[in-house]
Regions:
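Nucleotide-activated sugar donor-binding and catalytic core shared by glycosyltransferases
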Residues: 1-170
């Protein structure tokens, strides 16, 4: 009998169906197209509380230091609104469905996330991912250089963001 090996990832296959060249979302109307858009997701229980607050403060610091950067963060968590809501270059929006998320991810300069699914999908869009965790279940992405584990400590997150924003070779 012959052996058949099936490999792949249906989430990656879905990207081919959901990402659209003529995609529109109202948040994109509020973003200066000349700026680098960073998409952020952060939801894991391990990051709730102070780890999230550190990342949020770092996001503010980076946005304030870079005139050419805007952030899109689909969120309904109150700590994010408490720390980030009064900055015109940080767009807090309602959580996105998969079609919207894939298309906004495709338009992003890079992505910051603690989501395993995002770690799988973003590299297929050619987007680097700063992983807001100390570990990952996707070590192949780290080995390939498409994912960078940065955790939630302010200095590590800021240095990784600065590197992607300023080093054209990355």
């Amino acid at each position: 009998a012959e052996t058949v090996f099936v490999t792949g990832n249906t989430a990656i296959d879905a990207l081919k169906l959901t990402v659209q060249a003529d995609y529109h979302h109202e948040v994109l109307d509020r973003i200066n197209p000349a700026r680098k858009m960073i998409l952020v997701t952060m939801h894991r229980r391990e990051n709730q509380g102070e780890p999230m607050r550190r990342v949020f403060r770092t996001l503010r610091q980076i946005v304030d230091a870079h005139d050419d950067v805007e952030i899109v963060y689909p969120v309904h968590l109150s700590p994010a609104r408490e720390i980030l809501s009064d900055n015109e270059k940080i767009h807090l929006i309602e959580p996105l469905d998969v079609l919207d998320f894939h298309n906004i991810a495709a338009k992003s300069y890079f992505i910051m996330s603690d989501s395993g699914g995002v770690q799988e999908e973003a590299p297929s869009l050619g987007k680097p991912v700063l992983v807001l965790r100390d570990t990952t279940e996707r070590p192949e992405g780290v080995e390939a250089g498409t994912l960078k584990l940065v955790g939630t400590e302010t200095q590590a997150v800021a240095e990784a963001m600065e590197a992607l924003l300023t080093d054209e070779s990355l």
